[in-house]
Regions:
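Short basic helix-loop element that most often maps to the first helix and adjoining turn
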Residues: 75-88
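N-terminal flexible/basic segments that precede or flank functional cores
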Residues: 1-68, 128, 133-148, 160-164
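DNA major-groove recognition helix of helix-turn-helix/homeodomain DNA-binding modules
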Residues: 113-132
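DNA major-groove recognition helix of helix-turn-helix
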Residues: 93, 104-108, 115, 123
Length: 183
């Protein structure tokens, strides 16, 4: 049993059926995986999301495979998930200057169609081995028709679940998107 950091009382663990979290540019709803530790003495809750890095990797791939045009906050999310500076990201995306990445992230200039597809491919390729629960097929992006949406459009949260993964590398749990996990 865990002890409360405030009052040292015992904390009771439960699993939250749904938990919505902003990962810094992309919002996800985590299903049946978030652990909540509740202290009945001081009424404090502590929330724990397992494998946050894996959740971020799988979320980035899921967003890259969604045909809705990328916004600046999502490009920034990709870069942060890849743990890159703007200069490193520009180099990885084969861009001439880091200023281009800055313009994309600040929505000063949108990502052009060809650059957007290349960015999506690169993000998926760089993360696919780390997000074993979220498969990536390059043909999906190659055939993708990008969808324009209104500037004030707020996308629904991506629904993410823990999935059991068995492969040559290792067995274990990983993150997958709800729609992809059901398929």
């Amino acid at each position: 049993m865990r002890r409360c950091g405030k009052c040292k009382g015992l904390m009771v663990k439960s699993i939250r059926p749904e938990h919505t979290e902003d990962l810094g540019g992309v919002v996800v709803t985590v299903l049946n995986a978030v652990q909540v530790y509740h202290c009945s003495t001081c009424d404090t809750d502590m929330v724990a999301i397992p494998d946050m890095d894996g959740l971020a990797y799988a979320t980035a791939i899921s967003r890259a495979l969604d045909p809705i045009r990328l916004r600046g906050r999502e490009v920034k999310f990709f870069r942060r998930v890849l743990d890159m500076t703007q200069t490193e990201f520009a180099t990885a995306m084969n861009l001439a200057a880091a200023e281009t990445v800055s313009r994309w992230e600040n929505d000063t200039r949108g990502v052009g169609g060809a650059c957007e597809k290349l960015t999506r491919h690169n993000v998926c390729a760089l993360l696919s081995k780390m997000a074993r629960g979220r498969p990536y097929d390059p043909a999906v992006i190659a055939k993708m028709e990008l969808v324009e949406v209104a500037e004030d459009y707020v996308p629904p949260p991506l629904k993410m679940v823990r999935v059991r993964v068995t492969d040559a590398a290792a067995d274990g749990d990983s993150w997958g998107e709800m729609a992809a996990a059901a398929a």
